[in-house]
Amino acid sequence: MIKNIVISFEEQKEESRGSVEFQVFSFTNKIRRLTSHLELHRKDYLSQRGLRKILGKRQRLLAYLSKKNRVRYKELINQLNIRELKTR
């Protein structure tokens, strides 16, 4: 599933690097990579800080997308297999 998403995003990479979906996709890849790194290196506090910053950026982008286009937001959440934003 993830490999198919990567391939579809790679095909669209040249024309849509600035799109919200591509940015969320790249942040999600960074988050997964940092999470696996932190499982091995629990006391790497700089990586923990970087992970929190990337999580915040992704959260802001997802909030923006959910306000602007709810259908694209739902599709992206399902494709990347991540949870929805908590509503207040």
Swiss-Prot record:
Pfam families: Ribosomal_S15 (PF00312). The keyword Plastid applies. The keyword DNA-binding does not apply. Disulfide bonds: none annotated. GO terms for biological process: translation. Part of the 30S ribosomal subunit. This is Small ribosomal subunit protein uS15c. It comes from Arabidopsis thaliana. The lineage of its organism: Eukaryota, Viridiplantae, Streptophyta, Embryophyta, Tracheophyta.
